[in-house]
C-alpha cells in the first residue's frame, strides 16, 4: 500500500519587497515614505509525495523552489493553502515535525563553525534527544558510508567544501529522519565528492526508505537520483512526471551507431540479410569495409532495445553507441517551451 507522506494543496505565498530608485535624494525620500512591490513567490502549488519516493524539484532561479522547501520545513507560513507532512502541519507542529526531518542547504552550514565536527554531532544528539545507542549506531554507519573518520576532530571552518558537505549530510541524518530535503547538496564539489554524495543518498533511500526531495541546478544529480520530476516556474507547477516521460517529450531524436560483421540489405531484394527497419527509426548512413559494416540510425519513437533486437537477429554486433540529448539540454528545452 502506497502511503502519502507529503501533501501540498493550493499553497500561496507573497512577499512584500521594498524598492527605491538609486541616488541620495531617493534614499532620503525612502526614509520618509517607503515603496514596496508585492512578489508572488508561490502562486498555486499542489503536489503529493509518497513515502520512500525520491523527487527532483527543479526550476530556474526565482521559480519558488526554496520558498516551497521553507514552507514544508515549517520556516515559512503560507498565505493560504494546505500543507500536511506525515499528518502534521509544519508551521503549527514544528517541534514534532522537525524531529523527523533532515535538511541540507548547500550554501548554508548546519554545523558549528569553530568546533570539531564530532562536537557538532554531539550537540545535535542532545537537540534531537537521540538515545545513546541509536546515536552510536547512526554515527558509526554515517562515518563509514561518508568516510568521515578523519574529519570528526577537525573544526568545520578547516574543512574543504567537499568534506563539509559530507559532514552536513551526516548531521542532517544523525536523528534518523523519515524525510530529507537536499537543496543544492553538490554545489561546488569535485567529481569524486559528487559521486560519493549521490551514492550515499541512493543507498539511504534503498536501505531505509528515506523520502528525498532534491532541489538543484545540477541535472546530473537529478538524473542519478530522481525517478520523478516536478518542474516549478513563476511560482506554479508546470510539469509533474517521470524522468523517462520528460526525456521522451523533450529529448528530440537520438542516433544509434551499430558496427557488425558482414553486410545487411536495406533495399528491395528478398533474402536472408534483408533488414526491415522498425517503425520509428530510419537509416542515416551505412559504410561497408573489409567484411564489416557501420550503420547509423536515427530514432524517433522506436526504443533502442527494439532496434538492437532486430539487428541482433540478422548480424553479430561488434560495437554499438547511442548519442542522445544531455539531461541539461533536455531541461533547457523544457524551460524554453514553458517560457521560464
Residue spans for each PLM region:
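Conserved ABC ATPase "signature" region
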Residues: 23-31, 122, 126, 134-151
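Conserved ABC transporter NBD signature motif
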Residues: 81-92, 97-98
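Conserved ABC ATPase signature
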Residues: 155-159
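Conserved catalytic motifs of ABC-family nucleotide-binding domains
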Residues: 176
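Catalytic Walker B motif of ABC-type/P-loop ATPase nucleotide-binding domains
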Residues: 180-184
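ABC transporter nucleotide-binding domain
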Residues: 198-298
